[in-house]
Amino acid sequence: MEYRQLGRSGLKVSAVCLGTMTYGEQNTEAEAHEQLNYAFAQGINFIDTAEMYPVPPKEATYTRTETIVGNWLKHQQRDKVILATKIAGPRRKLEWIRGGPNAIDRENLRAAVEGSLSRLQTDYIDLYQLHWPERNVPMFGQYQFDPSQEFDGDTEKQWVSVHEQLEALAELVQEGKIRYIGLSNEHAWGVMEFLRVAAEYKLPRIASIQNCYNLINRGYEFSLTEIGYREQVSLLAYSPLAFGHLTAKYLEGGSGRASLFKGFAQRYEKPNVALSSAAYAKLAREHGYTPAELALAFVYHRWFVTSTIIGATSMTQLQENLAAWQKPLSKELLSAIEQLHLRYMNPAP
């Protein structure tokens, strides 16, 4: 396993991060702890979770994932684990989370951090991320910015400024409750604004951005790759298997998260997702890879990806996902991937 610098932080994270969003829904606590133990035995030191998890989010399961992770974490040497979690943002109809998170402001940030610390049974969070932006942006399958959608057209409302968000996060950093901060599902303007405000007012600097990145969603490359490189903001790539679509199981009539939770991952319900997934699966098999190995190896070894977040619902899946780390792709195969990319350009934005 490789370990890489997370932005300008003092953290060295494993190149593979264990995601946890199935814990408490598709995985029991015992299964989750087995995964965590195995992953750490293989050299992973980085866990990603969120107050909103498990998915799909619902009141009946809210808090389960962080609680399960916390029950494991309390038996570990804390400084050997790099723990990341996230605050749920506004406008996602999650009324059971803190009474409905209507803003990423001082009050909500403090309540969210305190809740996560309690569930995770720890005194501090290594990387605290804003799960999605406070402001109106296209995300989770949307692909066009529409200013008329700001607060559903309510012109009296204002989103919490980046300055106010950073000031609230700075207080939590100063108190030792969080060490570093990051963004998620963010766009170029947001990243640069967080960097600008942090520099101007001497507030905490973002270390990372956690965005979707895979063979059928390479939107990060258009505007964020250069920003990440020049500003030293690390990419944490989530959904490398595109919610299972890049394993080819849905092409073969199999079941999984996309079939169990229809409508949850709308970005993968686009017209060319099946066609592009089939083309990548065919390419993988022609070169002696499984479709999942090709998809994972592609993301694992991109020069701008600091850590790839993987998730599994079984130990077999987890073992296969980690084994793909040992199978980098040849120049010939990477060239063939680029040809398919030109034919099926980002079908799952």
Map each language-model feature to its residues.
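Short, well-ordered amphipathic alpha-helical segments that serve as non-catalytic structural scaffolds
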Residues: 35, 107-117, 165-168, 280
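N-terminal small/glycine-rich loop or linker at the start of catalytic domains
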Residues: 7-23, 84-99, 129, 136-144
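Aromatic/hydrophobic pocket-lining residues that form the small-molecule binding cavity
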Residues: 32, 65, 109, 113, ...
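Active-site mouth loops of central-metabolism enzymes
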Residues: 20-30, 95-107, 153-160
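Beta/alpha (TIM)-barrel catalytic core signal, keyed to glycine-rich beta->alpha loops juxtaposed to Asp/Glu
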Residues: 133-339, 344-348
